[in-house]
């Protein structure tokens, strides 16, 4: 009975460690995704001011 309790306690302990490691990895993945989204927004902000005057010029034909 004592051996069974020890092995169950060990399994519970290892499972808890595994769960916490998975949560940390998931959090890190979410942060990476969030960083990629922020980079995309920055690229869009830099892209629009460069080509917006040219697009307006082509549309209005007042170049």
Swiss-Prot record:
Its main location: secreted. Residues 23-44 form a propeptide. Residues 1-22 form the signal peptide. Belongs to the frog skin active peptide (FSAP) family. Brevinin subfamily. PROSITE patterns: PPASE. It is found in: Secreted. Disulfide bonds join 57-63. It comes from Amolops jingdongensis (Chinese torrent frog). This is Jingdongin-1. The synthetic peptide has antimicrobial activity against Gram-negative bacterium B.dysenteriae (MIC=35 ug/ml), against Gram-positive bacteria S.aureus ATCC 2592 (MIC=4.7 ug/ml) and B.subtilis ATCC 6633 (MIC=9.38 ug/ml) and against fungus C.albicans (MIC=18.75 ug/ml). Has no activity against Gram-negative bacterium E.coli ATCC 25922 but exhibits low hemolytic activity at concentrations up to 200 ug/ml. Keywords: Amphibian defense peptide, Antibiotic, Antimicrobial, Cleavage on pair of basic residues, Cytolysis, Disulfide bond, Fungicide, Hemolysis, Secreted, Signal. Expressed by the skin glands. GO terms for cellular component: extracellular region.
